[in-house]
Protein backbone atom coordinates (compact mmCIF):
# COMPACT_ATOMS: atom_id res chain seq x y z
CA UNK A 1 0.00 0.00 0.00
CA UNK A 2 2.84 2.40 0.82
CA UNK A 3 4.07 2.26 -2.78
CA UNK A 4 1.00 4.20 -3.94
CA UNK A 5 2.22 7.30 -2.09
CA UNK A 6 5.04 9.63 -3.16
CA UNK A 7 8.44 8.67 -1.73
CA UNK A 8 8.81 12.09 -0.09
CA UNK A 9 5.58 11.52 1.80
CA UNK A 10 6.71 8.09 2.99
CA UNK A 11 10.08 9.54 3.98
CA UNK A 12 8.28 12.26 5.95
CA UNK A 13 6.29 9.62 7.84
CA UNK A 14 9.38 7.51 8.58
CA UNK A 15 11.40 10.47 9.85
CA UNK A 16 8.49 11.92 11.83
CA UNK A 17 7.86 8.60 13.56
CA UNK A 18 11.56 8.43 14.45
CA UNK A 19 11.24 11.82 16.16
CA UNK A 20 13.37 13.53 13.51
CA UNK A 21 11.01 16.46 13.12
CA UNK A 22 13.33 18.90 11.36
CA UNK A 23 14.38 16.22 8.88
CA UNK A 24 10.78 15.17 8.27
CA UNK A 25 9.85 18.80 7.64
CA UNK A 26 12.62 19.06 5.03
CA UNK A 27 11.62 15.77 3.38
CA UNK A 28 8.23 17.23 2.46
CA UNK A 29 9.21 20.87 2.00
CA UNK A 30 10.45 20.50 -1.58
CA UNK A 31 7.32 18.76 -2.83
CA UNK A 32 5.08 21.25 -1.05
CA UNK A 33 7.00 24.26 -2.41
CA UNK A 34 6.23 23.02 -5.95
CA UNK A 35 2.50 23.06 -5.16
CA UNK A 36 1.69 25.35 -2.24
CA UNK A 37 -2.01 24.71 -2.72
CA UNK A 38 -1.47 21.25 -1.20
CA UNK A 39 -2.83 22.05 2.25
CA UNK A 40 -2.43 18.44 3.38
CA UNK A 41 1.34 18.67 3.05
CA UNK A 42 1.31 22.15 4.58
CA UNK A 43 -0.50 20.74 7.62
CA UNK A 44 2.02 17.91 8.01
CA UNK A 45 4.90 20.38 7.77
CA UNK A 46 3.22 22.55 10.42
CA UNK A 47 2.76 19.49 12.64
CA UNK A 48 6.48 18.69 12.39
CA UNK A 49 7.31 22.35 13.02
CA UNK A 50 5.10 22.34 16.10
CA UNK A 51 7.09 19.43 17.50
CA UNK A 52 10.33 21.31 16.75
CA UNK A 53 9.02 24.32 18.69
CA UNK A 54 7.97 22.06 21.56
CA UNK A 55 11.50 20.65 21.74
CA UNK A 56 12.89 24.21 21.70
CA UNK A 57 10.49 25.17 24.52
CA UNK A 58 8.74 27.70 22.27
CA UNK A 59 5.35 26.68 23.60
CA UNK A 60 3.39 29.59 22.13
CA UNK A 61 4.53 28.71 18.60
CA UNK A 62 4.08 24.99 19.23
CA UNK A 63 0.45 25.55 20.24
CA UNK A 64 -0.10 27.88 17.30
CA UNK A 65 1.24 25.35 14.78
CA UNK A 66 -0.55 22.39 16.36
CA UNK A 67 -3.83 24.27 16.03
CA UNK A 68 -3.09 25.41 12.49
CA UNK A 69 -2.23 21.87 11.42
CA UNK A 70 -5.39 20.51 13.05
CA UNK A 71 -7.54 23.09 11.27
CA UNK A 72 -6.00 22.33 7.88
CA UNK A 73 -6.21 18.57 8.36
CA UNK A 74 -9.88 18.68 9.41
CA UNK A 75 -10.80 19.32 5.78
CA UNK A 76 -9.34 15.91 4.88
CA UNK A 77 -11.33 13.86 7.43
CA UNK A 78 -12.08 11.12 7.99
CA UNK A 79 -9.09 9.56 6.14
CA UNK A 80 -6.52 10.88 3.70
CA UNK A 81 -3.12 9.71 2.55
CA UNK A 82 -3.70 6.48 4.42
CA UNK A 83 -3.95 8.36 7.74
CA UNK A 84 -6.79 8.46 10.25
CA UNK A 85 -7.32 12.21 10.04
CA UNK A 86 -10.10 12.31 12.63
CA UNK A 87 -7.78 10.79 15.25
CA UNK A 88 -4.84 12.93 14.18
CA UNK A 89 -6.89 16.14 14.48
CA UNK A 90 -8.03 15.18 18.00
CA UNK A 91 -4.46 14.42 19.02
CA UNK A 92 -3.13 17.69 17.59
CA UNK A 93 -5.83 19.66 19.41
CA UNK A 94 -4.75 17.96 22.64
CA UNK A 95 -1.12 18.77 21.82
CA UNK A 96 -2.08 22.44 21.40
CA UNK A 97 -3.83 22.43 24.78
CA UNK A 98 -0.81 20.80 26.43
CA UNK A 99 1.54 23.36 24.84
CA UNK A 100 -0.67 26.18 26.15
CA UNK A 101 -0.67 24.62 29.62
CA UNK A 102 3.13 24.26 29.55
CA UNK A 103 3.52 27.88 28.43
CA UNK A 104 1.32 29.06 31.28
CA UNK A 105 2.95 26.86 33.92
CA UNK A 106 6.62 26.25 33.26
CA UNK A 107 7.07 24.72 36.73
CA UNK A 108 5.22 21.60 35.61
CA UNK A 109 6.66 19.08 33.16
CA UNK A 110 3.87 18.38 30.71
CA UNK A 111 4.13 15.65 28.08
CA UNK A 112 2.64 15.64 24.64
CA UNK A 113 0.47 12.71 23.66
CA UNK A 114 2.33 10.51 21.20
CA UNK A 115 1.69 11.14 17.52
CA UNK A 116 2.40 8.06 15.42
CA UNK A 117 1.61 8.15 11.71
CA UNK A 118 0.51 4.82 10.25
CA UNK A 119 -0.32 4.39 6.57
Give the location of each predicted region:
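Intrinsically disordered, low-complexity, charge-biased linker/tail regions
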Residues: 1-2, 9-10, 83-119
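Solenoid-like repeat scaffolds
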Residues: 32-37
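Boundary/linker segments of alpha-helical solenoid repeat arrays
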Residues: 38-41, 73-87
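TPR/TPR-like (Sel1-like) alpha-helical repeat modules
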Residues: 59-77
Amino acid sequence: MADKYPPEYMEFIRLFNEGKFAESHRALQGVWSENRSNLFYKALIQMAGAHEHWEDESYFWAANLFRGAAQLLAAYAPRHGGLDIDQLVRTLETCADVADAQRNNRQEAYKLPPVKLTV
